[in-house]
Amino acid sequence: MSETSQTIPELVSWAREREFSLSLNTERLSYLLAIALYNNERFDGEMQESDLVDIFRHVSKEFDQSDNITTRANNAINDLVKQRFINRFSSEFTDGLSIYRLTPLGVGVSDYYIRQREFSALRLSVQLAIVADEIQRASESAEEAVRRGEDEYYWRRNVFAPLKYSVAEIFDSIDLSQRIMDENQQSIKEEIAELLTKDWQAAIASCERLLDETSGNLRELQDTLNAAGDKLQAQLLRIQDCVMGRNELYFIDQLIVDLQSKLDRIISWGQQAIDLWIGYDRHVHKFIRTAIDMDKNRVFSQRLRQSIHHYFDAPWFLWTAQAERLVDLRDEELTLRDEDALGELPEALEYEQLSDLHDQIVEAMQALLINHREHNQPIDLSLVLKQQLDNYPLSRHFDVARVIVDQAVRLGMASADLSGVYSQWHEINDYGAEVQANVIDEYK
């Protein structure tokens, strides 16, 4: 534990002495946020009691509570003062009127709900650029201190202080923003679930938009993190090399370890969030496909019959491959006994099972990949996938890609994975599918 941190008993004693007791219901939280927004528009950061009463009146109007405004406003103000969200000041210079200012606690709570909600790739890039500059200056100062034999005061001011009070705080801000994005993803999942529960047919387009937007945002943020992560780690290692073996600078070495852990956690969060979201994306699409398969003989046929009935009011076009099956729409309860109406499976596919198809793909891919191994040729999965997927229909792309990746990782591994180098995303078909994999160049 670094010397600037506090122990658990110290923090417990500090909180106990000040008798902290926080309780914010929806109305009180809304009132605090409204105060924070109003305070941001004032140059002096000070508010009078009449201002707080007017703000409370607007909040109460939104909650449809317009009675006893003054009394309830005074109670709310006293409650926020008691919980130390705002401070009250009064003196002879204010003619007996009290002035109010937000406390650090009030600023922190309101800032979390207002400004921290915006987390974009642009903001992340700016934060990482600031961090890179601070670490660069700190590393140069550390190397200069080693050459000139500077004392501990120099190390604290030019190396420790920027890392502790600038870099670490920005890392904490990014970490907090990522946790907020976790909440946003959960709210999007709830929104998708609600859409699918109410009317999944009308919700398919909205679900696709939400899924694509979230996937794109996560991938863009992760690309930004990957681009800066290695450079930041390298700069931290430069500083760590400068303090290695110097026991009097233990506090800097401990801080470097903490920063490296935070940076690793920030970068790994992005990839983990993408993996989890991809799994959820597949789950939603599987649900939609299942719902369509189960529903096609009920709601779909009913909607089509309604469209036919109202054709002259709303004309439409219908393309069909087997027009004779339209007779099935005459009666929803019709028992289909005619074998011709159901159609027959082509003889070439009649006895083809999924396992047989899988075995065929495995044999073909093994023959392809073993050839690379025998000639000690590196396997570029993105290139192999793109070449092979061109030979298969879209419906089999997922199975083929899964088999290729599975067989490739059994043959060898990528040396770039051991050095922590992230590969770029490469397209593997004409439908937007991408893969991120280093070249396999070491065989087992």
Swiss-Prot record:
Task: Give a short account of what the protein does.
Answer: Involved in chromosome condensation, segregation and cell cycle progression. May participate in facilitating chromosome segregation by condensation DNA from both sides of a centrally located replisome during cell division. Not required for mini-F plasmid partitioning. Probably acts via its interaction with MukB and MukE. Overexpression results in anucleate cells. It has a calcium binding activity.
Q: Which residue stretches belong to region Leucine-zipper?
A: 211-239
Which Pfam family, any one, appears in the UniProt record?
Answer: KicB
For this UniProt record, the keywords arranged alphabetically read as follows:
Calcium, Cell cycle, Cell division, Chromosome partition, Cytoplasm, DNA condensation
Q: Which GO terms describe its molecular function?
A: calcium ion binding
Taxonomic lineage:
Bacteria, Pseudomonadati, Pseudomonadota, Gammaproteobacteria, Pasteurellales
Annotated protein name in UniProt: Chromosome partition protein MukF
Which branch of life, at top level? Bacteria
Compartments reported by the entry: Cytoplasm, Nucleoid
The record's listing under InterPro entries reads: Chromosome_partition_MukF, MukF_C, MukF_C_sf, MukF_M, MukF_M_sp, MukF_WHTH, WH-like_DNA-bd_sf, WH_DNA-bd_sf
GO annotation, biological process: cell division; chromosome condensation; chromosome segregation; DNA replication
One GO cellular-component annotation of the UniProt record comes to:
nucleoid
Share what the entry says about its subunit structure, partners included.
Answer: Interacts, and probably forms a ternary complex, with MukE and MukB via its C-terminal region. The complex formation is stimulated by calcium or magnesium. It is required for an interaction between MukE and MukB.
The principal location of this protein is cytoplasm
Q: Which family does it belong to?
A: Belongs to the MukF family.
